[in-house]
Structure formats: C-alpha cells, structure tokens
Amino acid sequence: MNLKLKIWRQQNAHAQGKFVDYTVENISPDTSFLEMLDILNNKLIQNNEEPVVFDHDCREGICGMCSLHINGHAHGPDTDITTCQLHMRKFKDGDTITIEPWRSRAFPVIKDLAVDRSAYDKILQAGGFISVNT
C-alpha cells in the first residue's frame, strides 16, 4: 500500500514545530506501524535527510515507550493496544495518516515524536503506580 504521512517535526521543547508531509510506498499490510516508520527513516537517510525521532523499546506491547497520537487517537484506530501492536492493515491504500507526539505539559517534546517521560518515571521510582481498569 502507498500512504501519505503528516508527521510532527520539532527540534526540542522550546522550538516551533510543524507538520511535514512524507510518502511511503509498497508497505505490506502485515508491517507494524513502527516498522513503517523505520522504512520511512531508511528512505530519509538514503536521501541525506534527517530521520524522524520516535521512542520504542520492546516492540511487544509491554513497555509503553512507543506512545503516539495517530489520526487524533492515542495509539491509533484500535483500542486496547499500543502503537507497536498496530499493523498497517488497519489503514487503506492511499490514506493520509497524521502522527503526533503526546500533547501534555508533563511530557515535553524532546525531538519530533519523542517526549520526556521523566515525570512518569519519577512516580514509578517513588514507589507509586498508575492503574488502569481492564
């Protein structure tokens, strides 16, 4: 599938950010969302452009590092999944996908789609926890 991407680019928390348009081509429906971003970044690097910065760690739906807003929804169109569990089969050929970082004062942008999660980490280090009804 061929997709248009509108990705939030921002140098740091104090810089003015903006959406930048990209295209990716021949993406398999079985590709994960983060793999699609990897494909875009490989293309950008080949063209001597700066890759899009985004967080990820386990890529197994465990750690929560990959949190993004996709088309205005946390983690994308599905519910009860993380961004790394989202696959491109949830989109249609020719779709435009808008990708943004979390918009929260507690999580300022480090760069592009990566945010500073230290406020959350401090809660965990202090012995606190965050619970979610499941």
Which residues make up each language-model segment?
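Signature of N-terminal electron-transfer/Fe-S-associated modules in redox systems
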Residues: M1-T134
